[in-house]
Every structure is written in structure tokens, then in C-alpha cells.
Amino acid sequence: MSGKSFERDSSGSRIGNETELIQTYLAPLAEGMAGAFGLTDDAAFLRPASGSDLVFSSDPIIAGVHFFHDDRPADIAWKALACNASDMAAKGAAPVAYLLTLALPEAPERDWIAAFADGLRAAQSEFGCKLIGGDTDVTPGPLSIGITIIGSVAAGAFIPRGGAKAGDHVFVSGTIGDAALGLALRRDPSQFSTLTDDQRALLLDRYLRPKPRLALAGPVRSYARSALDVSDGLIKDLRRLAGASLGIAVKFDDIPLSPPARAALAANPNVRDSILAGGDDYELLIAVAPENIGKFVTSAGESGIPVYDIGVLESKITTVVVDPSGVPIALRRPGYDHFSR
């Protein structure tokens, strides 16, 4: 990280150059990381613990795509780190450090970047990692926040996406659909006029501040054959878990829903599509061999995060969600796609 200049701001309320941005607001997030060098070098190093492998994942979030331009900066920062930390949980890994690439359309207000840094500080404290490096720059496009997260897992214990087998039971953590409904609420509050203030607040919180299921990393590492997080919609990510040779028929009534989601569904059955395909849940889908189900459920229970058995993977069937009559539910789209609008 080095010091590029921003356009001069006569009001004095905006950051004057990259050095100020980094050293005043971002460098404190790297305190205690020896390999970060206080964000004064062009590179950083990370020494893995003996007997462990490093795990890497990278997901950017972009204004107008993954968040609203006027979302609170602390919420934007939290979401940027949370969606990456979620990948660590699915791999059975613990977050250690992250790289931040911050592309700004203009020099940020000092109050804005201070709140953004506070959001990162809260998130990294919650997730157990620290900033180790990255870059900042000016872009002609919208605000873009790219994070590469680095985690650690016992050597050979990485949990792949493609390890599931026929007969494995699929578990899902938490509840599904809250974030998609929170997004719909953010766009048009009038759709959810029948919900209470507390119900609306929960849906918005699930959209703005996802909670990566890091407490499940241990049970996943010990007992899962395959796992991934639900980022692009339950149906789409179930198909990813199943792969080309497997499928699963999930009963809609077996999918865990929060009380606000159930209330929204009762008021408007059309939100079912959003629940199944909306994405941004950041819950975990976990394939467990039959002989490990008891141990997995016990271990997951000790984490404090609920998990639910939603079906069994089978050979040569299509992945679908079925209604109470056993009829597959037709969706307008199976999930989120970055290149489909």
C-alpha cells in the first residue's frame, strides 16, 4: 500500500491522499499482525502454524449490486468481510487474515471511512482475523470492496464442495430466506406492512449483517463429506452440492424458516420464490454420511447453531423442492447469477 493522491477537496472533509486513508483508518486494523508491517510495505507474509494448511477465498461486493449506495458504511464493511468468512466455515477452517482492495469513486468523507473502518474492526473481532494488506484506488465505476480471506485448517482436513456421495444426508444451518426478504423490504417496505417492527428489523439485519456460521467449522471439519455456504440461493447451491451425478428432493415444509419469514409467506405466498432462490443467506449446506449423523448433530448442537436434516442425496435424480403434494415447485429463476440480469 502506497500513497496515491485524491482530487483536492476545498471543504477539508474528505481524505486528502491514500497515505492518510491507510495510516489513519486502515493500519490500526492490522495491529498485532507481524507480517503486515503496519501496511507500509507492498506485500505481506503469513506463516502457517505447524501441521496446518492455508485456505483462501475471495468475494467482492459492489455498490448497486450487493449493497445500496446509501447503506451505512459500517454495515457495508461488515457484509464484505462476513461473506468471505462464511466460505471459511464451509471449509472447516478458521479465519486468520484478509487482504482488502478498496476502489472508491472519489475521495471518501472522513466520517464515512471512519465508520467503514469501525465496521471492519467489529467484523474482524467477531470472526477472529485481522487485516494484513491490500490496496486502495480511485475508480470511474461504483464503490467496490474486494476481500481475499485467508484461513487455517488442520493439514488434510479441508472440506471440498464435491465430496458428497449418494445416501449422504444434507443438513442446513439456521434459517433460509431472511436476507432475500430483507432485500425486498429494503427496496419496498410497503410489501411487508403486515409484519411487526421487530420482524422487519430481523429481516433487514439478516440482509445487512449476515452471520457466518464459524462455530460450525469444527463439526463440518470432523464429520462432513462436503459443504458450501448458501450465497446464491438454496436451490442453486443445493445443485452445486449435489454435483452432476446426484440430486435431492427437498420438501418445502422441511426448510427452516424464521417467524418473520413465515409471517411474510402467510401474507404473500409469492415470496416463496425469494425464499428459495434469493441468496445472501450465508447458512451452510452440509453433506454427512449416515454413520456420522449422530455425532454431527451432537457436535453441531454444542455449537449453539441449529442444523436441520432436509433430505438425502440420490443418484440420477434432479434437485428440486416439492410442495406438500410432492409436486416440484417451479421457480422463475433457480438462484442468483452475476451475469444474468
For each of these PLM feature ranges, what is it?
Residues M1-R72, K91, L100, G119-A122:
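Extreme N-terminal cap/leader segments of soluble proteins
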Residues F158, G182, L216, K295-S299:
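Hydrophobic side chains in well-ordered alpha-helices
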